[in-house]
């Protein structure tokens, strides 16, 4: 029979996981408390938190969310979870940049919007621009042809108006001179 404290801890982890739109799993073996504090300070402004977890409890919590996914591989050895509550790509970029300077921080993998990613895929995803940039690029690529179409449709009408205006001014000059 599980202890009430463990049941409560699993429930707390489960609630954190439910509220996050991405979970990044890392190994932190060998990093000092000061290093972890520095890492937490880098990702806190990005609306993310970095927490060391007990593997058995975290695995129970995550299996409630994703019972059909094989996630045991992420919970071998010392494990910390980064909970991303906003755009995960900015947090990924910050984690990868931090790992360049602190080689002891190793990626195990992650879950972003319900999809499981390996450590290598997580590093590749970190190279993507933030969601807002991608969306603005998509909107720009959609609106550019539309603007061009509108201009091309307006051009003959504008040309006709300018021509008629020029003819009217010319006739006005002729009638004044007579």
Swiss-Prot record:
Pfam families: Ribosomal_L10. Gene3D superfamilies: 3.30.70.1730, 6.10.250.290. Coiled coil: none annotated. GO terms for biological process: translation. It comes from the Bacteria. One of its GO terms (cellular component) is cytosolic large ribosomal subunit. Belongs to the universal ribosomal protein uL10 family. NCBIfam families: PRK00099.1-1. Forms part of the ribosomal stalk, playing a central role in the interaction of the ribosome with GTP-bound translation factors. PANTHER family: 39S RIBOSOMAL PROTEIN L10, MITOCHONDRIAL (PTHR11560). This is Large ribosomal subunit protein uL10. The gene is rplJ.
């Amino acid at each position: 029979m599980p202890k009430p404290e463990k049941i409560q801890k699993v429930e707390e982890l489960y609630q954190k996981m439910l509220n996050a739109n991405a979970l990044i799993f890392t190994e932190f073996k060998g990093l000092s408390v000061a290093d972890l504090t520095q890492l937490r300070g880098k990702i806190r402004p990005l609306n993310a938190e970095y927490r060391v977890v007990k593997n058995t409890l975290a695995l129970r919590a995550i299996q409630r969310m994703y019972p059909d996914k094989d996630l045991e591989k992420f919970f071998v050895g010392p494990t910390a979870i980064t909970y991303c509550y906003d755009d995960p790509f900015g947090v990924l970029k910050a984690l990868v940049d931090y790992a360049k300077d602190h080689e002891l921080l190793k990626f195990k993998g992650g879950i972003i919007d319900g999809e499981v990613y390996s450590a290598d895929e997580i590093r590749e995803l970190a190279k993507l621009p933030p969601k807002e940039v991608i969306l603005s690029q998509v909107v720009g690529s959609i609106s550019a042809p539309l603007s061009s179409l509108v201009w091309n449709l307006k051009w003959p009408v504008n040309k006709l108006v300018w021509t008629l205006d020029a003819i009217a001014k010319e006739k006005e000059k002729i009638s004044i001179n007579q």
